[in-house]
Regions:
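Flexible "cap/lid" subdomain of the alpha/beta-hydrolase fold that forms the substrate-access gate
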Residues: 4-8, 13-40, 44-137
Length: 137
């Protein structure tokens, strides 16, 4: 999938839509000569997997989704309903501005991986995930 591992990384942000990512999954099946498959995804990859099966049921007959249920399209962009508090960290917001996250994460790669894998220094308070003034999403 574009932008991951050693895959291509288009510069234009508009090249990373769900339609493009689903197209990447279809392209992978084509390249491997596979007509139909079960697709699995975790987190952001689960969103791609759900949409791959929704948009191309001829190619994806089932979904294995980890940590993200199927979510119908919302009239409001997800990034607009996430709390924008200084102490709240939502990775989707964190990666919106090109180069910002990369500069911070690459500053100390070892420490980045220790925090990501071990949770060191992360505040796990549920308050980070509560929308202030809202009854829910």
């Amino acid at each position: 999938m574009r932008g991951y591992g050693q895959s291509d990384r288009p510069e234009a942000i508009d090249q990373y839509t769900l339609l493009h990512l689903v197209g990447d999954m279809v392209g992978l099946l084509d390249a491997l000569g596979i007509q139909q498959a079960v697709i699995a995804g975790h987190d952001w990859g689960a969103l791609v997997a759900w949409h791959a099966a929704l948009l191309r049921p001829d190619r994806f007959r089932a979904v294995i989704a980890l940590s993200l249920p199927y979510l119908q399209r919302s009239p409001v962009a997800p990034t607009l309903v996430m709390p924008r508090r200084k102490d709240a960290v939502f990775y989707l917001l964190y990666f919106q501005e090109p180069g910002v996250a990369e500069a911070e994460l690459e500053r100390d790669v070892r420490q980045t991986f220790l925090k990501m894998l071990g949770g060191g220094g992360l505040n796990r308070s549920p308050q980070h995930f509560i929308l202030e003034g809202k009854d829910g999403v």
